[in-house]
Every structure is written in C-alpha cells, then in structure tokens.
C-alpha cells in the first residue's frame, strides 16, 4: 500500500489525475474502472483539462463503471450513466462503444450480473480501478458483511448508504433507489492497480479502521490492504489519524 498525502481536495484531485493520466499515456488502450460520487469529480475535471490542452487521448480507452442503481433509467439525471457523461465522457474523445456500465433497467438480476462479468472479462480485466470509500467502509456498493469472493451482484442498499445518497435526490429518501448492481470485491481485487481518493475529516476514522485495522468483511475496503498495487491519495484531514 502506498499512501500519498495532499494538502487539500484540489491537490488530491491533481495527484489522482496524474496517476490516471500516466496510465492512459503508458497504455493508450487501457481499461479504466471508474467511480461516481463527489470525491472523484475533481480528478475528472483535471482529466478534462488535460484532454482540452492536448495532453490526453481517450480514443482507445475502455471504461467499466463500478456500479449503477437498479431500476433507474440511464437518462435519469442521477443515474451513474448520466453522472459519468456529465462529468467526463461528454467532454473527452472516448468512443461510446467503449463505455460500459451495469444496465440498471435490466430487472433480471442474475442475467445482468452475468452479462457485466463477461464484459469485464472480454476487455481483459481492469488496468486501473478508481475508488472512493463510504463512511462504513463500503467500496462500490459492496456493503459491510458482503462476501469478499463475489463478482458483479445485486445489493440491497443499507439505510446509511440511502441516507448518504438522498442529497442527490432533493433530500428525499423515498426517491433514492433501494438496490444497485455493483462489481464485487473479487472483481475489484483483480484490477492490476487500485487508486482510492479520500478527503475530509469525516473519512478519517474509516480510513484508519480500513487500512490499519483487521481485514474483515465488516469493513469491505480493508481487503485492499492485501492488494499488490494499491494507492491511497488523501488530503490532510482524511489522513489525520494515520
């Protein structure tokens, strides 16, 4: 595990974008595992800046996203399909045929999970997986106590996750989807490099627990202690307890 300490959110975003940029430059046809949520947005902004400056070319890049809400049409403004297009895909030259997310409108969970696992296999696996971390240690939508050996699966979101995500749905908990498709821990651990971004004092406790405590399904992110190429990039507040 490599830890990169940064002074603030902007610096964290810049460092994370540097690592992703290097991956694209070194392997133009790389497979990027991408994440949603507030934390990676700054890194995506930096990647768009570098693309606009002529420093990055996404034309051969393939993306596979971590997760998607089940039952939400992709055109919904809070679907992760919409999030990724709004924050990254619409602003760079990635081939739409190379963009992959779970299909939240496929209500046949078994078939959709099997399909998405096959998509990831067919592109050769993930070269670099970007992650955030939840206050309870979840990564993707792998919630506490989920088995470490799962591939893509359908999950019932915990009340804590639903509460955390209601800010994206006008603060109305009833509008937040209650299920999601997510890459499993096994899939994440098979990525050749894993990059986690974390910021703010609110994440300090879980960072300490996940990366300096026992490896346990109770804290899904703790498994990353065992990954051979895991980079944690955080600001001073998030890393204040380690």
Each language-model region and where it sits:
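Short beta-strand segments
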Residues: 33-37, 65, 102-103, 130-133, ...
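Glycine-rich phosphate-binding loop
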Residues: 124-149
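Ligand-binding beta-strand-loop-alpha-helix segment within the catalytic cores
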Residues: 56-129
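ATP/nucleoside-binding phosphotransfer catalytic cores, i.e., glycine-rich phosphate-binding loops
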Residues: 183-186, 190-242
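Glycine-rich N-terminal segment of FAD-binding domains in flavoprotein oxidoreductases
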Residues: 26-52
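N-terminal glycine-/serine-/threonine-rich phosphate-binding loop
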Residues: 1-32
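A glycine- and small-aliphatic-rich helix-loop capping segment at beta-alpha/alpha-beta transitions
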Residues: 45-57, 80-82, 144-153, 213-215
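Class I SAM-dependent methyltransferase SAM-binding "motif I" and its flanking Rossmann-like core
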Residues: 140-185
